[in-house]
Amino acid sequence: MPVAVLTLLVGALLFIGTYTATPYGSTATAQDVRASTLDKAAAATEEARVQLLASYEVTPGTYVDRGFLVDNVLHAGNLGDIHFSLLVPESYDVTRPASLFVTLPAEPGLYYQGAGANLQVEEFAFTAQGYDPNMIVVAPQPNDWTQTSANQVVELTEYLLLAYDIDPERVYLEGYSYGGETLSLVMDTKPQLYRAALHLASQWDGDVEALAAARIPLRISLGDNDEFYSVEAAQRVVGELRALYEAQGLSGEEIDRLVVLDVKPASYFWDPNEQHGGGSPRMARDPEVLGWLFAQ
C-alpha cells in the first residue's frame, strides 16, 4: 500500500477522534452522540479516499470488447504503466458493494502481444460473470510473469478497491500458465488482498510462507501430463503448505479447505494430447474449478 494510503487513513482516524469529545446539549442522548460521531467518521473516511484516489493517474481505455473497456492504463510511477481491461456491470450500484475478479493472462495474452489479446485467447473473464452478474472483472496485461508484474497486480487491485465500492472480502484471483506464475508471486507479496486464489496449469515461483500466514484458500489444478508443468512440482508446493498449516495447529479438515490439489486425468481434456493449451477453455467452463473460487 502506498505511503499516501497510510497517511490519509491515519489522518482520517485522527479526524474521527476529534469528534468523540464534541460537546452536546444536556438533552443529547448517548445514541445521538454515537450517530453524530459515526456520520462524521464516514465523511472523514470518504474525504481521505477521494484525496487518495486523486493521486492516481489513469488513462481510459480506447474501445469496448463485449462489455470490457480495453487498454486502460494506470500510471504507477516506478512500477511503470499498468495496462488492463475492465468490466463494470450496468447493475453496479455504489450503495451495494460488488465483488471483484482479477484474471491473469497466459501467453499469448500479455501486453506486448497486443492490447486486449488476453480477452481473445482466454474465457475466464467471461465465464466468471455467470457466477455473479454484479461482479466487476479486471483483466490486467503485464508484459511478463516476474515480480514487477506481481507488484503491478497488487497496485491495480488496491487502486480498484479505492475507485469502486468493492467488498474487500470478495476479491478473487485466478491465473493460468504464466498467469499462474504471476499469481504465485502475488500470493508471496500481499495475499491478504484476496479471498481465494486459483492457480491453473502452472508452477509456483514464489514462497508459500506469506500465503500460509494469511490462510488464503488456494486451489491448484493441472493435467496429469501437462506439456509444460509437472504434477510433482505442484505436489511439493502443496506439501510445503500443508506442513506449515500443521505447524499452526490446524486440523486436517481445515487444511483440506485451505489447499486443494486437483490433478486432471487425460479423459478430462477434449484432446488428451494437448492438456495445456486445451485446459484453459475446459477449466474456464468447469464449475468445479472456477466455481470453487467464488464459493470461498
For the regions a protein language model found, what residue spans apply to each?
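N-terminal Sec-pathway targeting helices
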Residues: 1-7
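A domain-start/cap signature at the N-terminus of enzymes
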Residues: 13-98, 181, 186, 249-256
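Gly/Ser-rich "nucleophile elbow"/oxyanion-hole loop immediately N-terminal to the catalytic nucleophile
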Residues: 90-96, 145-177
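Active-site machinery of serine-nucleophile hydrolases
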Residues: 98-100, 104-154
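Short alpha-helix in the alpha/beta-hydrolase fold that links the catalytic acid
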Residues: 116-117, 229-247
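Short, proline-enriched alpha-helix->beta-strand connector loops that line the catalytic pocket
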Residues: 132-133, 212-218
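Primarily recognizes the serine-hydrolase "nucleophile elbow" in alpha/beta-hydrolase
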Residues: 169-212
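C-terminal catalytic histidine-bearing segment of alpha/beta-hydrolase fold enzymes
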Residues: 221, 227, 244-296
